[in-house]
Amino acid sequence: MTPFPHVIDIDDSLRHARELMSRHEVRHLPVKKGAALVGVLSDRDLKRALDPDLGLAPKDELFVRDVFVPDAYIVDSSEPIDTVLDHMAAEHIGSALVTKHGHLAGIFTATDACRAFSRHLRSLFPRRTPDDVA
């Protein structure tokens, strides 16, 4: 999980969203309207909206509100991780917004899940070096 992720306002431009994602090397941005958490914007949503083949408005005319996902998966920090993973897999979701006491505390992504699973596998099956075989 990435604690205290960068967020974007629903009224910000997609150009600003792209710059923010690029600068911080993230693929998901929680979306807020004022203090309220209202959804998530993914790099996939952004790329699709800015694809010239789709004939959408020029990028400077599009805003986060035009393309973000309003029904983001939001979980409390106490939610068991297996429940979160099952839901993400079943719904083909790339991220879960994590809250604590009703406030955004982090974002858990499919990349985070892969990293954790990789660490777990290495703890179970340590890598062998050529010297271990001899």
Which residue ranges define each predicted feature?
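The conserved cystathionine-beta-synthase
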Residues: 7-25, 32-33, 74-92, 98-99, ...
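Short hydrophobic beta-strand motif reused across regulatory alpha/beta modules
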Residues: 27, 32, 40-44, 94, ...
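Tandem CBS (Bateman) regulatory domains
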Residues: 1-4, 42-74, 80-89, 104, ...
